[in-house]
Structure formats: C-alpha cells, structure tokens
C-alpha cells in the first residue's frame, strides 16, 4: 500500500509537483486542458501520455511518460523563441527536481520536437518514482498496542 503524500495520491503528488515546479521556473501559466482547445500564448501545457504502475520489490513503482508543450507568443514569428525555450525547458528538467525536502524526481531520456507551422515545441521524457511501502498488516496490532498502553 502507498502512503498518501501530503494528502495526495502518488500520481497527484508527482504531476502536481511538476506543474508547480514548471510554473515557478518559467514564470508561465501551466495549462491543464486539451491542446485542441483555444490557448492563450505564450503558455506551457503539461500532458501525461502514459502512466504505468508495478512493484519494485514491495515498493510501488510508477513510470510517467510526459510531454511538455510550449506555444510561442506569435503564430507568425518566433523560431528564435522556440529554440531558446527548448534549451530553457531542457535545462529546467535536467537534474533533480525537489518536490519536498525528502522526495525528488528526475526526467530521463529528454528529447525535443519542433512544430514550426504552429510555432510550438514539445520536450518529452520519462519519470520513474518509487514510493515507500507501508505494511498494513501490522497497523491494527500497533493501534491495539497503543490503546492498551494508554488504558494500562
């Protein structure tokens, strides 16, 4: 079983933390909507393409395939902006991303794609996260022990 982290599921914790991190580092609003919808430029959209969950020993292991889309200020010019933002986003996603004092993630296998006609780019990669295992089989025993100690 996975502990909730700050009251959030592991998926909410990782994706929410990454959105907060990107907003802080880019000074842009990270939109949470379908790319086909009308978007206000410039902006970033974080898209989680795939989430897989399995066990690493007894510990829950999550893998996230993420796409970070950047839409330039203008549809009519902005190649230089795209190249600069690609470099900036790659740098932001490099190294450890601290979500809390004790939990960090890394984005691996980062690559970029440019959509020149749309004046947009995509930086994509994967996040692997392993969470602590909590053995619930001892939880009732510990609760009973705690009650007995308080009464005793």
Regions found by a protein language model. Name each.
Residues 31-40:
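Short acidic low-complexity segments
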Residues 40-49:
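A short, hydrophobic beta-strand-centered structural micro-motif
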Residues 1-31, 50-152:
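Charged, amphipathic alpha-helical segments and their flanking helix caps
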